[in-house]
Regions:
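Short, flexible coil/linker elements and helix-boundary hinge sites characteristic
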Residues: 1, 15-18, 67, 243
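Bacterial N-terminal signal peptides
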Residues: 7-17
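Bacterial N-terminal signal peptides that target proteins for export
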Residues: 1-7
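Predominantly soluble domains enriched in secretory-pathway, periplasmic, or organellar proteins
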Residues: 22-409
Length: 409
């Protein structure tokens, strides 16, 4: 009898409290593209392929008033803030540079150059989840690890790369670089992280005779389990050995082949790109692309020393997409022959990335406030979408299916 009463009591408790429920399933995600509007401090979200329809947009500086108060109360920070405005910002504050979504698609992590930080923005509320202030006074390019759990950010003025937990913003490690760390690229499934330092790009000492003033420009390769440097590469000696002493060794956008055997990169002041064999540690080819007759050869007119800034590769490794920034075009290049296709007119294209379906290259046209998609197969423009003020970085990301942008704040 006692056993029956206990069983009845247990059943009654289960009815009253409810049966244990399985954990809620994670929301289904859709792939999108994020476009960072550097001067506006906003992000536009567009479809990652097809017609590239705009899905919405939101601010990545909801805390701007607080940040500006902190800056204006600190004379040193204020001096750097105004220096960024008059230098790389071309008279504007640089409010968003790079961005990636968290693996669950609920937040966007963005670097904010003028505010010298990295923040996580909740994609439902538009509010900050966390903020990490970088060392020094400017945040720049980022990279996300292949598993999506870590994000690396270049701290320009402190010659440091910080590696953060993408969910919490906690620093997992950091390492020293050359002068003005810029591009970051994970390789070997995330085992290594490559950082390219570009040196001083904000002075007018751009003539070859003044190259020595540009500082220490090198690649720093670290092991991501220890963040210790395993290799440094100064392309100066490699370029000289190839017979191109005239080219800068400041590496700008860079992309590896799918098998990691070749690295393609742009350098300061040059209308073209370089091919580097990773295993043999040699420059193997240099491609010079056409100059726009309307573009001045005065190096001081190139934005932050970049004549061309933007490089992507088709998923099969067969084609390269080049953003010819100061020459106002983009073009698809056959990687085997290095023959360029049609020169697609573009207004100061500043970045290139691959569409979600791998068929197109998407460039940001920073002077026209739009992004354009160019077919890898035909080399022709297939779509253009209006975005915000001065688009730069374009990145693939994910949001929940049915996502709508948070209210503007």
């Amino acid at each position: 009898m006692a056993r029956k009463l206990l069983a009845f009591a247990a059943l009654a408790a289960l009815v009253l409290t409810g049966a244990p429920q399985p954990a809620a399933a994670a929301p289904a995600l859709q792939e999108v593209m994020f476009v960072g509007n550097n001067w506006a401090g906003t992000v536009d979200v567009i479809r990652s392929s097809g017609g590239y329809a705009r899905l919405g947009g939101f601010s990545v500086v909801p805390d701007l008033d607080t940040r500006l108060l902190d800056i204006y109360l600190n004379p040193i920070r204020l001096a750097y803030f105004l220096g960024i405005r008059s230098g790389p910002g071309e008279g504007h504050d640089q409010l968003v540079d790079d961005m990636y979504t968290t693996p669950d698609g609920t937040a966007l992590v963005a670097s904010r150059p003028s505010l010298a930080d990295v923040v996580s923005i909740d994609l439902r509320t538009g509010l900050l989840r966390w903020r990490f202030g970088v060392s020094g006074y400017r945040a720049d390019h980022m990279a996300v690890s292949p598993d999506g759990t870590q994000v690396a950010v270049s701290a320009s003025t402190s010659n440091t790369v910080h590696v953060l937990d993408i969910a919490t913003g906690r620093q997992l490690g950091s390492f020293a670089t050359g002068d003005k760390p810029h591009e970051n690229v994970y390789t070997d499934g995330g085992r290594y992280l490559w950082n390219m330092s570009i040196g001083e790009v904000n002075t007018d000492l751009d003539a070859p005779a003044w190259d020595w003033t540009k500082g220490d420009r090198r690649i720093t390769v670290v092991d991501t389990t220890t963040f210790r440097t395993v290799r440094t590469i100064d392309m100066r000696a490699r370029l000289d050995a190839y017979g191109r002493r005239d080219l800068s060794n400041a590496i700008r956008p860079a992309v590896f082949t799918p098998d990691g055997s070749r690295l393609y990169f742009q350098v300061s002041f040059f209308n073209g790109f370089v091919e580097y064999d990773v295993a043999t540690d040699r420059i193997t080819r240099v491609k010079t692309l056409p100059e726009n007759p309307a573009t001045s050869d005065d190096r001081t007119t190139f934005v932050n020393d970049s004549r061309h800034h933007g490089l992507a590769m088709s998923p099969d490794g067969g084609k390269l997409c080049v953003a010819g920034t100061m020459d106002d075009y983009a073009t698809i290049v056959d990687r085997a022959t290095l023959q360029e296709g049609p020169l697609v007119p573009a207004s100061k294209p500043y970045w290139a990335t691959v569409s979600g379906d791998g068929r197109d290259c998407v460039i940001s046209e920073s002077a026209a406030d739009q992004v354009s998609a160019i077919s890898f197969a035909t080399g022709r423009r297939v779509a253009t979408v209006a975005v915000g003020d001065h688009p730069q970085r374009v990145r693939i990301g994910h949001v929940p299916v049915g996502w709508t942008a948070p209210a503007t704040r």
